[in-house]
């Protein structure tokens, strides 16, 4: 028999346990609502998202997509604002400014993070790739 003609038939029989609802409430501590990783939930009605979270008994949702830019942070905070008790949105650092800011980069980042906190950011998302691609050529910190 040629491999392309081989279609195995499952023979294992196990007990099926339908799960109607979650056993415990949950916090989704790492997720995305934006287009890049989150399926564009940020553009869908908030009520639809809340219904889905309620069905899964997710009590709190941490959205990391505010870290793309301050504009994205503000968009996410505005969209989720009516249910702000259910969401935490993280901000981020614009690493592209490192070269331009030079020795002032750390001070600049601290000032931007204070601004983001003022917008309502609940934390800071540091992308893994940042540590792999950002390097200090010369700094006097």
Region spans (language model):
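Active-site gating/metal-coordination segments in enzymes
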Residues: 1-4, 8, 72-141
């Amino acid at each position: 028999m040629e491999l392309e003609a081989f279609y195995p038939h499952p023979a294992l029989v196990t007990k099926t346990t339908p799960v109607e609802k979650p056993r415990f409430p949950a916090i989704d501590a790492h997720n995305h609502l934006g287009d890049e990783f989150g399926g564009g939930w940020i553009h869908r009605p908030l009520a639809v998202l809340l219904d889905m979270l309620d069905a899964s008994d997710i009590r709190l949702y941490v959205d990391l997509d505010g870290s793309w830019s301050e504009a994205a942070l503000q968009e996410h905070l505005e969209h989720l604002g009516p249910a702000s008790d259910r969401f935490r949105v993280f901000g981020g650092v614009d690493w592209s400014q490192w070269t331009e800011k030079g020795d002032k980069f750390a001070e600049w980042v601290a000032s931007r993070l204070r601004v983001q906190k003022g917008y309502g950011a609940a934390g800071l998302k540091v992308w893994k790739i940042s540590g792999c691609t950002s390097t200090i050529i010369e700094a006097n910190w």
